Amino acid sequence: MKTNKYLFIFAFILFSAQNILAQETKINKTSFDLINLDYKGLEKVKALVTAKKYEDASEQLLKYYRGRTDVKNLDFNNTDRQKYAGKKVSDNTLELANDILLHKFKPHKGYPAYDYGKDINWQYRPVQDQLLTTFLHRTAFWEPLGIVYNSTGNETYAKEWVFEVRDWIQKNKQGAYPDDKQYAWKAFVVSFRLNHWSSYFNMFINSPHFTPAFLMEFLNSYKEQADYVMNNYTDIGNHRLYEALHMMYAGSSFPEMNHAETWRKSGITVLNDEIKKQVLPDGVQFELSPSYHIGTIKIFLDALQIAQLNGVEKEFPESYHNLVEKMILAVGKYSFPDYTFPLYGNSFLTTKSAMLKNYQVWTKVFPQNKTIEYYAADGKSGLKPEYLSSSLPNAGFYAFRNGWDTTSTVMQIKAGPPAGFHSQPDNGNFVLWVKDRDFTPDAGSFVYANVGNQENSKRDWYRSTKAHQTLTLDDQNIQNDAKLIKWQPDGNLQLLSYLNPSYKNLNHERNFLFVDKTFFIIIDRAIGTAKGDLAIHYNLKEDSKASINSLNNSIVTNYSDGNNLVIQLLNKDKVTLKEESSFVSYQYQKETNRPAFVFKKPKNNELTQGFISILYPYNCNKPPEIKIIENKGHDLSNGKIDLTLTINGKINQIQQNLNP
């Protein structure tokens, strides 16, 4: 059966590529308009162009590129093929490459490979997710062809790549279809294509199927695309950063082109400008997404590396370096001891190994920073931070913690300003991590792109306020614009207090108390004239086997290892406790059901209503006995907290004035 499969593949390739020579574009003088013929090393090319021997000139130009070693690509260089030659590739990579031969493409890992047809239909949209189509036009899915080609030397893979590049160029000219600026000619997408194509150029340059005619077609298309990005930068956000970085890639990958220096300088100018706009004073990128924050660090550092390769590092000022260093330190503040972080703002779950690799790159850039070294060495060298609880006040990221190792208790909290596209209406949301367990993971995003103006119910649910650990009115989404009231990160009674204008005529004041560096009390106040059903939501880890006790309004996890959590409402007024539907998504297009619960009470008048919750981690299979006495001075509606809290016989006096 496998033999028949490969016979079919090669028959398919012969059919697809039978007209490849007929596609060869006639080479003339204008073919060289994009080349700086005075560039060092192109003397023979210039002489042949001057002599009007254009075919010979293109052959000489190809010879130049095949022998070029002074231009370095961050991903794949001409000389790298020696590392791949004869090296066994993974079964998955080989399968992907062979599928590409059949025009079965897998642009995004969240979806299977789809058949785009013998006559490739670049407009085929098999699912209602615009991300899949934009990833198709980034063309990163071609990489397995290059890897397998450089491993095996089998020209079938190179021939198919040349064919598909030509097919893409022919069928995706600007204006070829009405919404091309949302897909193939979206500047953000084009910029990624430039980046990938510069690597593929090196992967396939030595193939006999990479002809002089194809070289000129490739370079002319590359020039058109780079000029397009430079003239169509996205106005704001991480897209603009990626576009600028990829313009630097373009300029450094093909310095022989007339516009190369303009492209490179354009990228540097944008990055120098945008780092001041997009990075808040506390070091967090302004879209407030932990994953995208790390992505922007890579953008800024890749730009520095490209500048170093081109001898123009000084075009990035010291302030640029300092901000990137601050960005790296911010990652440690919003992370847990296992190097993961909350999935705020369309983030997806990372791994410790991935983050250690990041830190090992970062510590080489900032070798004098002992805190970055500490993270990079997994605590074996360097210096751990001098603080425990910490804040990133401009982003509204706060962390209570009692240590830096995996036996620690850490609560990460989001209470920030309005943010960009990736931000979700989730102020007040928190993630509680105790002894290497994330008890209340953020929901994640599952999917974060719609198709045009079409709604996506999954995207809407994952973005919704009720999917997060915070307060809602009638389960509607809130607006984010938190204002800090008080932050006290030291001592045995630590406090975070903020006010958020969640709804029209309803402000949400949330107060987090970290008691004895052991447990938490959350005090919510709904202030304003709005009426409706108030609720506070608790979404727990999918394997927690959580259960409820309606008699004392408590939720308990049931882990067999004894590392458990009880959440109990301490209100004396009538509150209902119910289970609700919830999910968590750690990877794109993958989700898991999880236990979730909601405490509800009506707000029928203008009086302030409140909730008082305790989150108590414990180390056995029996939850602690928690009792509360409201003392005479206790008046939640007026911001006066005076409670006597008894936990397994230990008495805690909790007194706090919540008024500014």
Task: Label each PLM-derived region with a short phrase.
Residues 23-106:
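Extreme N-terminal leader/anchor segments
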Residues 444-445, 657:
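Residue-level structural signal for beta-strand termini and adjacent loop
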Residues 103-123, 135-136:
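Short alpha-helical hairpin
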Residues 1-24:
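Bacterial Sec-dependent N-terminal signal peptides
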Residues 6, 347-348, 352, 450-660:
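CBM-like, beta-strand-rich accessory domains located in the C-terminal region of large
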Residues 440-443, 449-452:
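Cytochrome P450 core scaffold surrounding the K-helix E-X-X-R motif
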Residues 114, 128-325:
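Aromatic-lined, polymer-binding surfaces characteristic
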Residues 280, 284-439, 604-606, 610, ...:
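Carbohydrate-active enzyme catalytic cores, enriched for enzymes
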